[in-house]
């Protein structure tokens, strides 16, 4: 995701000189061919602005804090639902309506669960989506999600891997409701070291290990609701953990392209990407807050999220921007689905250690992550029981 540390001129020159670092090919499951990369990739830097670049060109843009979609295999994303937001705009509740049910659930969220999961998740050398470590970390995460459903006795719920040709699968957990109207909660599971992605460590504690474990803990507690557990909620809720966000929103594009083609009725999508770093905010003398992204998002959903934070969180929100294609919510939006994005702080105070070996747990606040878990849980519950017309 997003902004990266500024490189020194000598380091930038070193990395640029290694234009195409040697990368081990990913060996996929039986019956699948080895993934072969193209020589160049078609990226979209803003609506309608495209460019062909090499893989090193992609990483160079990321080192310059420039985000993009890699649309090499997804040029038609959004073409089917091109008029969806105009013709079928979603009306969200005017205010939160389930306070008496949600507040007791919020008390069941546990920081220790997030810490335990994040300690293991960051122990993989990297979660780079084309590495064996990335495939292994995804398999481990799938096991944790499956265990969460099993421990809750969620016999109606399911979890599956959404495979990709590069080896690291995305993950989708589904909590069926009485309709196919669907609310999606997302985070990305991959990490990257932009200096040498295939070689150097990328613990990715904040980006986006923090979001990954935040929504996993929200899922655990959401399943303590009888209405969610027995499938009597009006709407279906899904939790997504996307692969290859760092490569240009690849995993989320693949999922939402499939949803678009299937005619899936996604009413809302919230992305939690980087939920744990607050030190720069505090150092600046500013109050701890939840950063609510206001550009390239659905305004109605974003307004409702602001109300959720005000009612259910212990800290305020601050409005901020992150630019085009800055995280996986952009894929949902491009596919024609209402999406929103929250981050750990005002964007200018977000974590500058991401995409390096220093994106470690020791710099994160689990108290702050708990606020994001409260937001996630409350929003998922409120929208699961909302009456979408």
Swiss-Prot record:
Its EC number is 3.4.11.-. Binds 2 Zn(2+) ions per subunit. Belongs to the peptidase M28 family. M28E subfamily. Zn(2+) 2 binds at residues 207, 246, 355. The keyword Ribonucleoprotein does not apply. GO terms for cellular component: extracellular region. It comes from Phaeosphaeria nodorum (strain SN15 / ATCC MYA-4574 / FGSC 10173) (Glume blotch fungus). Keywords: Aminopeptidase, Disulfide bond, Glycoprotein, Hydrolase, Metal-binding, Protease, Secreted, Signal, Zinc, Zymogen. Residues 1-18 form the signal peptide. This is Leucine aminopeptidase 1. Residues 19-89 form a propeptide. One of its GO terms (molecular function) is metal ion binding. GO terms for biological process: proteolysis. Glycans are attached at residues 99, 156, 180. It is an enzyme of class 3 (hydrolase). The gene is LAP1. Monomer. Zn(2+) 1 binds at residues 188, 207, 273. Its cofactor is Zn(2+). Extracellular aminopeptidase that allows assimilation of proteinaceous substrates. Gene3D superfamilies: Zn peptidases (3.40.630.10). Disulfide bonds join 322-326.
């Amino acid at each position: 995701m997003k902004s990266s540390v500024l490189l020194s001129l000598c380091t930038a020159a070193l990395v640029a000189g290694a234009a195409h670092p040697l990368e081990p090919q990913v060996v996929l499951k039986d019956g699948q061919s080895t993934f072969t990369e193209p020589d160049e990739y078609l990226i979209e830097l803003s609506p309608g602005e495209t460019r062909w670049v090499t893989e090193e060109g992609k990483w160079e843009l990321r080192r310059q804090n420039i985000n993009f979609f890699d649309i090499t295999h997804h040029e038609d994303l959004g073409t089917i639902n091109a008029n969806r937001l105009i013709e079928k705009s979603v009306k969200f509740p005017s205010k939160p309506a389930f306070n008496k049910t949600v507040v007791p659930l919020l008390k069941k969220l546990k920081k220790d669960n997030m810490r335990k999961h994040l300690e293991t998740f960051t122990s993989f050398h990297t979660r780079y989506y084309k590495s064996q470590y990335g495939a292994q970390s995804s398999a481990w995460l799938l096991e944790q999600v499956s265990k969460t459903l099993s421990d809750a006795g969620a016999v109606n719920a399911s979890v599956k891997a959404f495979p990709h040709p590069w080896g690291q699968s995305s993950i989708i957990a589904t909590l069926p409701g009485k309709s196919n109207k669907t609310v999606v909660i997302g985070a990305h599971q991959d990490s990257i070291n932009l200096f040498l992605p295939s070689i150097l460590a990328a613990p990715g504690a904040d980006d986006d290990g923090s979001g990954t474990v935040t929504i996993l803990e929200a899922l655990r507690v959401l399943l303590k609701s009888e209405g969610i557990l027995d499938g009597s909620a009006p709407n279906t809720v899904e939790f997504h953990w996307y692969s290859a966000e760092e490569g240009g929103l690849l995993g989320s594009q693949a999922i939402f392209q499939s949803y678009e083609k299937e005619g899936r009725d996604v009413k809302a999508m919230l992305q939690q990407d980087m939920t744990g770093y607050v030190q720069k905010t505090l150092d600046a003398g500013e109050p701890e807050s939840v950063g609510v992204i206001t550009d390239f998002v659905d305004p109605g959903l974003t307004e409702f999220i602001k109300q959720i934070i005000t009612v259910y969180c212990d800290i305020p929100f601050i409005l901020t921007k992150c630019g085009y294609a800055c995280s996986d919510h952009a894929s949902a939006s491009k596919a024609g689905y209402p999406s929103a994005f929250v981050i750990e702080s005002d964007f200018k105070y977000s974590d500058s250690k991401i995409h390096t070996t220093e994106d470690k747990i020791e710099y994160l606040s689990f108290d702050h992550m708990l606020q994001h878990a409260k937001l996630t849980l409350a929003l998922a519950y409120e929208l699961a029981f909302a009456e979408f017309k």
